[in-house]
Amino acid sequence: MTVAHGVGPNGVAPPGSSGIQVIIVGLGIAGLVAAIECHYKGHVVVGLERSPGIRVLGSNATKVLQSWNNGEVLRHLVSQSDDVAAMEILDPAGKLYALDSMDGYGMGEGMIIHRGTLVHGLYEHAKSLGIDLRFASAATDYWEDEGQAGVTVNGEQRIAAACVVGADGVHSKTRDYVLGYQIAPQPSGLAAFRACFSANLLAGDPDAQWILEEAGVQDRMRRYITTGGLGLTLSTGKRGQNVIWQVWHRKHEKADESWENVTDARVEDALALLQDWPTYPQVAAVLRHTPSEKLADYKIISRDPLPTWRSRGGRIMVIGDAAHAMSAIAGQGGGQSVEDAATLAICLELAGKSRVNLALHVVERIRYQRTSIIQDSGNAIYSQMRDPDWETIEKDPSMMKFPRPEWLFGYDVHRDVYEQFPYAMRAVQDNTGYRPRNIPSNSKYQVVHDYEKPVAA
């Protein structure tokens, strides 16, 4: 069976030229990137978001954004991102043990950006393309038959398309339909206080100014690590305009699973965890300015890979956190959502209007093993920070660096999917095994640092 060549990794198809209609449920990172990528590949998109309005990417994800509008979208987002040259690794006394470069996340590669800023930028670009985005529109029911799939919006209006893509996050209703049941998260026993607020709130407090010493030039990031899984990451953002911090802890009874839900978290509770640190006066001087409405306490959860991402009828599937919720510590939730979205758009383009079911099956074949391996990375990464042996670390500071495997950070999803689609499609049609090229050689996540930063032209 022949395969269309498509417009290629950097190509843009005429709007609506594929004749494939796609309903996307959820307009977070995965949903908005899927809407934009599908539009660029000639598909007709309707995006649904139950909220009334719009509410950290590695180098593997920014390759996708670089292809939009001659790189202008990425340039704008980078201008709103954080500029961190290296992360300082310290003990609770403030002794510096390692400097971890931001290779894979730094300027010219990936970016460190507040989720709300990123989502807003994606939304503005999608809106500029004229994509049909509908807010206050909850998908309350799902259905499919041999020729189409659809949803009921707000319990009233039925809309149909060639396929439905659920990008509706960790509490996905689309996933419930796909599986036929709800899945429960597996608590890790960890939680994290999380806050981001304007650095202007530090004005007038001389004890807090140390964190802003490089404001206007670049940002700084400090990670304090101690025993028992307790740690603090404290940084500035947008060259000193924002202050961002997280406290990882095990007292998670009041924590919420969502990154965004503001709970009754109190900064006093976070500070109490750090009160025995020699650096407490210094860090408390900054943290105590956190507004209560900017603070959340969320649970670090884990989920096993789903048995499938696709419905029995084959026209409804999940992507992003709905398909493979990542531990926050892995730093790949947004990146893998972007890769899913790009893969979806290309597979629909290459399969064509008459083979939408096949396209969604190929998406799963190309993406499933990669995301499953990354889902399993949280424990390996966290083990670096749990109960550190500072004497050993002082002899070999590299052991505290964040893992940067080449197969993950060096991945070009556009190029890979265009090249691999025929092979993955044949495996689906013949019901044979398929090994994607986007996974490590031993099919396991390992703490390695073999990613090589691209040389500037």
From Swiss-Prot:
Keyword Manganese: no
Family: Belongs to the paxM FAD-dependent monooxygenase family.
Required cofactor(s): FAD
Family annotation (SUPFAM superfamilies): FAD/NAD(P)-binding domain
Free-text function comment from the UniProt entry: FAD-dependent monooxygenase; part of the gene cluster that mediates the biosynthesis of the mycotoxin meleagrin. The first stage is catalyzed by the dipeptide synthase roqA which condenses histidine and tryptophan to produce histidyltryptophanyldiketopiperazine (HTD). HTD is then converted to roquefortine C through two possible pathways. In the first pathway, prenyltransferase roqD transforms HTD to the intermediate roquefortine D, which is in turn converted to roquefortine C by the cytochrome P450 monooxygenase roqR.
Name the record gives this protein: FAD-dependent monooxygenase roqM
Gene Ontology MF: a single term: FAD binding
Top-level taxonomic group: Eukaryota
